[in-house]
Amino acid sequence: MNEYLKNIKYRTLLNSDLIDSIGNSLYDIVFVIYASTVSNKSLAVSLASMATIVPALLSVIIGVWADRASKKVNYMILTRLSQALLFMALAFLIGLNKSFGLFLVLLLINIISDILGNFGNGLSLPLLQHSVAEKDLNSAMGLYTASNTTIQLIFQAIGATLIVGFNYNYPLF
């Protein structure tokens, strides 16, 4: 925790990943709920639930690409901006009339965004290692992992609550 308070590079990287985790957690739970409202909902919910598997299966390849990237900071910024643009497109598209075809487009956007997120996370790990002294690295990584896990759990619950509170108004997300 001390590293978070005194090291601006570490704090920036952690905050960036936490914001990414918040967005992903909110979106993932809302997307499964959205899938349950389209035609052929059993298949849609199954596909939405399984969509997280594709980026996980590709994570080794994505990690290698991230390791080989020469301008990690530039790629990380580009990755996060690309994710933001994808989510803006998604916010527009999700407001259109529901159909299974539209759901598949949204699913593809979700998978691409998750792959980009994995790439961005892979880029940030070496930056994290360079921004924290070796003696503080274990505690910094512990806080990093614990924070991300906690944020994901909390915001999945918040996402489910908010979507009900917003009367299933998906474009608000």
Regions found by a protein language model. Name each.
Residues 12-28, 51-64, 73-85, 105-164:
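Substrate-agnostic recognition of the 12-TM MFS/MFS-like secondary transporter fold
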Residues 32-38, 91-97, 154-173:
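Transmembrane alpha-helix termini and helix-breaking/packing motifs in multi-pass membrane transporters
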Residues 40-41, 70-74, 102, 133, ...:
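A helix-boundary/kink motif common to multi-pass secondary transporters
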Residues 81-99:
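C-terminal ends and interior cores of transmembrane alpha-helices
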Residues 34-38, 68-69, 127-132:
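Helix-to-coil boundary motifs at intracellular loop junctions of multi-pass secondary transporters
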Residues 45-48, 75, 140, 170-172:
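Alpha-helical transmembrane segments of multi-pass secondary-active solute transporters
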Residues 6-14, 42, 99-107:
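Primarily residues marking transmembrane-helix entry/exit sites
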Residues 27-54:
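Extracellular/periplasmic helix-loop-helix junction of adjacent transmembrane segments
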